[in-house]
Amino acid sequence: MNWKKYINRFKSRDLSENGLPTSILLIIGIIVVSIIVDLFIQKSLLLVPLISSIIISAIITKWGIIKLKKINCRQVVRKEGPSGHFQKSGTPSMGGIFIVPISLILTNLFALSNNTFSKQLVALSFLSLAYMLIGLIDDWQSITLKRNKGLSVKSKVILQTIVGIIFLVLIYSQDLNNTDILIFGNNTINLGLLFWPIALFILLAESNATNLTDGLDGLASGCGAIVFTGLAIELIIRGNNENYAIASFCITMAGAWLGFLIFNRKPAKVFMGDTGSLAMGASLAGVALLTNTLWSLLIMGVIFLAESVSVIIQVGVFKTTKKIIGKGYRVFNMAPLHHHFELEGTKETIIVQNFWLITICFVCMAIMLR
């Protein structure tokens, strides 16, 4: 074997354009944190569902990429996006169609084996699958029409609202909700009837925020895995028996997205599509609503928030200035925020790594502020 040939080939690679090393570090880091939590908290059982979901998700994703290629489910890149993204055109998409069901099956199996199965898990499973289906319809239309646009914004919001209302009716009828919102420390605010419209807004906002974040290889899957892990740890620390099943749900979701990340990091071999991103955001919002961790989710999901706010600012300022002075002004080079940094010349992997690091810092902050 010509070892010199392989060594020279390795040296010639631009490792800054490969997200595998940092993805492996992220996976190892979350595994180590889960081990520490399990060792120091008696009832914590994070490691087994985490490892299981990582392995199974990675296997299913590898198999799924082949299937997606066979049925020609490939990404269509929008013309107005960054020019560097045109090379991503043709990458298999709709990867979330494998990850979401697998994570839900594993979650419910773990819950049944640990006698922690609950109505909350049923509600979360419904919410995740329903939003996945909305994303699936959107992705399928985009692929069949061969354009980077599936459902209209209006249609998507209507479907998300209908599912959100069904979910809220479900948790109300089963008395799974708490209209007291926990903020700093143990301080609470009772929202009363205001809780329900706010809850619906959070479902729509979070699902669309993760959708906007899914614009760089490994960005949404990495950030999502970190936030799910943070929520799982917070719920374990609380020590409430009712929250253990939800903590298991969170860590299984984290593991599933980490397994997916192995193939979604740069250069991505598959994208999650709206099928995955909408389900991810809805799941995070659902967990927060059921476990009174809305404030924690707001802090932990700072990247999701920043991505959404950047779009709101960009569109709002552009339309306002165009109406007033006849010419639209752009605050950012392009929105969402990650595209702004891309056009500034920052490499995609560097943006993703920095956004992961920011998410980790804010997850730690949220846990310390609980």
UniProtKB/Swiss-Prot annotation:
Keywords: Cell cycle, Cell division, Cell inner membrane, Cell membrane, Cell shape, Cell wall biogenesis/degradation, Magnesium, Membrane, Metal-binding, Peptidoglycan synthesis, Transferase, Transmembrane, Transmembrane helix. CDD domains: GT_MraY. Disulfide bonds: none annotated. This is Phospho-N-acetylmuramoyl-pentapeptide-transferase. Pathway: Cell wall biogenesis; peptidoglycan biosynthesis. Its EC number is 2.7.8.13. Coiled coil: none annotated. It is an enzyme of class 2 (transferase). GO terms for biological process: cell division; cell wall organization; peptidoglycan biosynthetic process; regulation of cell shape. The chain crosses the membrane at residues 21-41, 46-66, 92-112, 117-137, 151-171, 181-201, 217-237, 243-263, 270-290, 298-318, 349-369. The keyword Magnesium applies. The keyword Cell cycle applies. InterPro entries: Glycosyl_transferase_4 (IPR000715), PNAcMuramoyl-5peptid_Trfase (IPR003524), PNAcMuramoyl-5peptid_Trfase_CS (IPR018480). Its cofactor is Mg(2+). It is a multi-pass membrane protein. Catalyzes the initial step of the lipid cycle reactions in the biosynthesis of the cell wall peptidoglycan: transfers peptidoglycan precursor phospho-MurNAc-pentapeptide from UDP-MurNAc-pentapeptide onto the lipid carrier undecaprenyl phosphate, yielding undecaprenyl-pyrophosphoryl-MurNAc-pentapeptide, known as lipid I. It catalyses: UDP-N-acetyl-alpha-D-muramoyl-L-alanyl-gamma-D-glutamyl-meso-2,6-diaminopimeloyl-D-alanyl-D-alanine + di-trans,octa-cis-undecaprenyl phosphate = di-trans,octa-cis-undecaprenyl diphospho-N-acetyl-alpha-D-muramoyl-L-alanyl-D-glutamyl-meso-2,6-diaminopimeloyl-D-alanyl-D-alanine + UMP. The gene is mraY. GO terms for cellular component: plasma membrane. Belongs to the glycosyltransferase 4 family. MraY subfamily. GO terms for molecular function: metal ion binding; phospho-N-acetylmuramoyl-pentapeptide-transferase activity; UDP-N-acetylmuramoyl-L-alanyl-D-glutamyl-meso-2,6-diaminopimelyl-D-alanyl-D-alanine:undecaprenyl-phosphate transferase activity. It comes from the Bacteria. It is found in: Cell inner membrane.
